[in-house]
């Protein structure tokens, strides 16, 4: 089986399933999430948001048996992928339950369903343990953002991770919002995990541009950048995102993930 993977979550899932060798093409975002693809000099293609008819020849040169694409899509890009004439599996997860189903779909393509079930059980067990541990700890409100212009709150599966850590998700997951609307909720914690930004969200500049200096999270230094691939790529690396979330909410009970970044609280003049 030769698979063209058009989103990082697909590449990561195949890697977790021990099927990295099936990837015959990927995207630059896949390489950022999984550097081994770069080391292998895997041919690069546009993702399922930017793929165009002009990219069909490059896709066909990689001789895929199957293209696997996932959200986010553009209708024009999906049409161009389908017109290439290669079988396409399209995924659109919203919840953790969707992610489990998608994992099984991918696993069936590479004869790895037993391993997929084991990985799913491990993730579910970890979430159950987190929920049990955090249920007696202080509940807190959390705003988590996947995009800054316009402001878009993170996806429902991330709200589920936050809920497992006894956090209340501010706003509607996956929906567009405004700086003023978030300011009115005055959340305890701010998470930034912008798609494609890795761990490079300029938190201090964002806070200043939105006039959020007065928010509780800013005043107490509880503003964090969580690497994009830990939250926005729906695969088993979500466990690393959960590590970041649990530490941010309950720092005395959970260790700090080395890749999460924190904005310091402002210095108060004496």
What are these model-derived regions, one by one?
Residues 1-270:
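N-terminal ligand-binding lobe of clamshell/alpha-beta domains
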């Amino acid at each position: 089986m030769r698979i063209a993977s058009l989103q990082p979550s697909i590449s990561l899932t195949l890697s977790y399933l021990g099927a990295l060798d099936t990837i015959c093409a990927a995207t630059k975002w896949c390489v950022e999430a999984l550097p081994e693809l770069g080391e292998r000099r895997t041919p690069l293609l546009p993702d399922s948001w930017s793929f165009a008819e002009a990219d069909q020849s490059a896709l066909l040169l990689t001789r895929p048996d199957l293209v696997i694409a996932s959200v986010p899509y553009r209708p024009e890009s999906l049409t161009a992928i389908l017109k290439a004439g290669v079988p396409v599996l399209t995924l659109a997860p919203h919840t953790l339950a969707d992610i489990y189903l998608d994992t099984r779909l991918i696993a069936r393509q590479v004869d790895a369903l037993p391993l997929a079930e084991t990985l799913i059980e491990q993730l579910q067990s970890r979430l159950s343990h987190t929920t049990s541990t955090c249920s007696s700890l202080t509940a807190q409100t959390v705003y988590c953002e996947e995009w800054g212009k316009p402001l878009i709150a993170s996806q429902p599966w991330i709200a589920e991770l936050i809920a497992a850590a006894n956090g209340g998700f501010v706003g509607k997951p996956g929906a567009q919002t405004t700086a003023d609307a978030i300011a009115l909720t005055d959340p305890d914690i701010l998470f930034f995990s912008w798609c494609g930004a890795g761990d490079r969200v300029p938190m201090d500049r964002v806070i200043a541009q939105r006039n959020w200096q007065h928010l509780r999270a800013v005043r107490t230094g509880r503003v964090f950048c969580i690497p994009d691939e830990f939250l926005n790529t729906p695969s088993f690396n979500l466990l690393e995102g959960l590590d970041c979330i649990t530490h941010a909410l309950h720092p005395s009970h959970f260790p700090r993930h080395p890749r999460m970044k924190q904005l310091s609280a402002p210095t108060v003049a004496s």
